[in-house]
Amino acid sequence: MTVHFVMLPMEGGQSHVAVNPVLVRCVQPHGPTQAEVHFDDQHWLVIDKTMEQVVRDLEIAGR
C-alpha cells in the first residue's frame, strides 16, 4: 500500500502527515492556494496546496 505525505498547516509551522490515497473520498478547492481533503462526512483537512496539486499527488501515490 502506498502512503503519500502531505504538508498540513499547524500552529507553529507545517508538519508532514501521512495520507493513504485509498482513504481520500474527494478533494475540493478551499480558496486560491488551499484544498480540502475529505475522508468521510466527519473527517477532512485543509492543506496548503491547490486542488490540482493534491489530485496530482494522489495520482502519483496511487501508482
Residue locations for each model-derived region?
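Acidic, Ser/Thr- and proline-rich intrinsically disordered linker/docking segments
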Residues: T2-R63
